[in-house]
Amino acid sequence: MEDLNEANFSHLLINLSNNKDIDMQYTSTLSVVHELLSAINFKIFNINKKSKKNSKSIEQQHPVVHHAASTGREFNRR
């Protein structure tokens, strides 16, 4: 299944919930779904922000050292 563009999906939910030709209970359900998705996205955004902040802090405390010979491969030199 293709990923839905978040902004387009949100726009669709808003438009459907504002549609006067649709049953009131259905529009209320769509509004609740929209609010729940917004709350979930906000929580995910905050978790990602904290994660990035923590990873930067850890990298500053323990810098990663890359060794060229640490790949475990031997090169055939002829």
From Swiss-Prot:
Phosphorylated by viral OPG054 kinase. Keywords: Phosphoprotein. InterPro entries: Chordopox_A30L. It comes from the Viruses. Residues 53-78 are annotated as: Disordered. The keyword Phosphoprotein applies. Required for the association between the dense viroplasm and the viral membranes to form the mature virion (MV). Interacts with protein OPG092; the interaction stabilizes both proteins. Interacts with protein OPG062. Belongs to the orthopoxvirus OPG157 family. This is Protein OPG157.
